Amino acid sequence: KFGHVSCEKLILCCGQWTRDLAATIGVNVPLVSVEHQYMITEDFGVPSDLPTLRDPDRLTYYKEEVGGLAWGGYEPNGIPWALEGIPEPFDFQLLESRYEHFEQLIELALPRVPKLSEVGVKQLLNGPESFTPDGNFILGEAPEIRNLYIGAGFNAYGIAAGGGAGMALAEWVANGAPPFDLWPVDIRRFGRPHLDTDWVRSRTLEAYGKHYTMAWPSEEHATGRPCRRSPLYDTLKSSGAVFGEKLGWERANWFAESGEEAHDIYTFGLPNWHDAVAREHKAAREAAVLFDQTSFAKYKLSGPDAEQALQWIAANRVDKPVGTITYTQMLNDKGGIECDLTCVRTKLNEYYITTGTGYATHDFDWISRNIPSGLNAQLIDVTSSNAVLSLFGPRARDILQLVTTNDVSHGSHPFGLAKQICIAGCPTLAMRITYVGELGWELHLPVEYAQTVYNILMTAGSPLGLRNAGYRAIETLRLEKGYRAWSSDIGPDHTPDEAGLGWAVKMKSNISFKGREAVAKQRAEGIKKIMATFTTESDIILSGRETIYRNGERCGWLSSAGF
């Protein structure tokens, strides 16, 4: 209403108003408003230098306030606000206090601070705060619009995070890239389910209630499920699948057998799914397993200049014959790994690209924004078009040959080759590649054929030891093989040489690509850190991010770990 303002870059840091304002220009910022209450007591001599106290076991926090305490907490049954949108006018007003709702926190707080039962209450304040579906704030350049930056959704810790977040966002705006790996708060971690405000609200209320609860290893969200399901969801569920969720997708984590509890029981020790994952792991090494990996993010890059565009973006060579599979990283200007994926040359002017489920928005944005100006190449998302069944293990070839008339022998279908084959009348792109370190194929096929192909594979393979397997077995298998995972082991702060992936960089060619100068500079100067894999002799449960000490001095950290 104040007219138009032209600017080169725009930053939206509008708190709970950010979502609605961004939506007016087609940008999705997944946050919602939740009522948050805290109490201010009368003065009872609290020292002004009292440190802030948090008691996660009792879901509460406390800080000094003019000789008294300001205290509150995060109840498990948070109250959403502004379900129909933030009313106008509303300028940081307070909401009506809800004493009955706050009573549950009072009961938790009294054993920790008994004095609260004796002192008077000045106020119970209730105000709306913006919260996000995963409890992390939102930073970065919006994937929908170039030069539009977001800083919002601070989950009631904006003051604590403000200095660091402000510095990071300022450098991101000034330099066009974040100063370091900010994936946990990157706006591109969100995807299609986050377009639905009701879904976001459901998940956000769960995250609000877990603000102070125990963060268990491998803990899954419970709300907003099931959302995205592969065609095999019901079949796998009836076979004992225990599902996890990634970007809205239901994915089989492990399979319970008769007599086993088909749900996760969280612990810092050996979890209840350990034996099930061990069975699946053993089958992959000795017979064969079938994974439903339909949730893979999948793109097609096509156009007369597709090869030229991908040669610039990818660190590995992609000027290879049709049918060749290329494993590659995509680097930033510092040589850091922004994407870790595979691409298949399906035609002279077309590539089929697959990447991890959780990186669908991030990787699509990275590829599309780095197609050089003036080149005729288009990137489209085909994730929902294709199902993916991954057949891995020593008996994989025997099983696959039983269900197709196409020759899948090593001589006809070697590693690194993708071929069109037919299974039960289904046109299938059979990609000879593996993330578990065994013989196998990723079978990419139209979703309507998934159930048919699954049935025929299981019927043919069961006598040879084929069994269902889930994502937790994929994790243990790839760890055993030493395969890297983006956002855990590698990322924007790690170069290919540091990650042990220098062999996948086309430095022996004269082809220009993004990040080449940084890789060359590091090779000339030498690396100062490197990724290593190792085992421990003792039966110790590790989850990742533990510190590594050598001779009493910190020398590194665990990026991933398994048992």
Language model feature labels by segment:
Residues L12-R54, F180, P184-G191:
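Glycine-rich loop(s) and the adjacent beta-strand/alpha-helix scaffold that form part
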Residues D57-R58, V66, E88-R228:
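C-terminal catalytic lobe of FAD-dependent flavoproteins
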Residues P217-G244, R251, E257, N272, ...:
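Conserved, structured C-terminal
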Residues I25-S48, Q104, A297-K300, A387, ...:
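Central beta-strand plus flanking loop segment that forms part of the substrate or channel wall
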Residues F2-K9, C13:
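Core beta-strand elements of the Rossmann-like FAD/NAD(P) dinucleotide-binding domain
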